[in-house]
Regions:
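Domain-level marker for long, solvent-exposed, non-transmembrane regions
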Residues: 1-189
Length: 189
């Protein structure tokens, strides 16, 4: 849950600060200002992906080290967490009974700290989608796909967790010229 919050809030902040939607698309027009071609600006899109991944890694590493001076706790949605524990890199405390996978004992025993440990593996990609939207219009969408691998460290065991998400970044409606006639096939009736 914490990972999900940190990833989504980090992506939101990078997009809010760094994103100019018009730079993500290249639109070529003819002399009459009609659209000839639309393409995605690969350089700008990859810069955005790189900034997102770097910011997520930095936030996780700072939380892992307990260095709260370099992160904005409110922006990441961590204002309700115990700051003493966050300074130790602890993101959650669970009862000892949960480790034994027994529902009767799940709420009993002392609490065990769960530390965040970035396994050094955040991978990302950009997906683009073009959809027909009415007559001679197109809806362009750009999404960031992230996969994050982490280790959850408990005193008895260590478990590797994988987290995948797809976050929409930009949508743009491109309007072409509406033709003077439109033929949508022959109806047999």
């Amino acid at each position: 849950k914490v990972t999900n919050i940190i990833v989504h809030r980090t992506v939101d902040k990078v997009i809010e600060k760094e994103l100019d939607i018009d730079n993500l698309y290249i639109i070529n027009r003819d002399n009459n200002k009609n659209i000839n071609m639309i393409d995605f600006n690969a350089v700008e899109v990859n810069k955005l992906l790189s900034k997102v991944i770097n910011n997520i890694q930095n936030n996780f590493q700072n939380i892992e080290k307990g260095d709260l001076s370099k992160i904005n706790i409110e922006e990441l949605g961590l204002e309700n967490y115990d700051k003493k524990n966050l300074k130790k890199g602890i993101i959650y405390r669970i009862p000892l009974g949960i480790i034994f996978n027994n529902t009767l004992l799940s709420n009993f025993g002392p609490t065990i700290p769960i530390k965040i440990n970035l396994n050094g593996n955040i991978s990302g990609s950009i997906s683009t989608k073009v959809t027909n939207y009415g007559i001679n219009n197109a809806l362009l969408e750009i999404s960031i796909n992230l996969e994050i691998n982490q280790l959850v460290m408990l005193p008895i065991t260590t478990e590797k967790l994988s987290f995948k998400t797809s976050i929409p970044v930009a949508m743009k409606l491109i309007q072409g010229i509406v033709p003077s006639y439109y033929f949508n096939g022959i109806d047999k009736n």
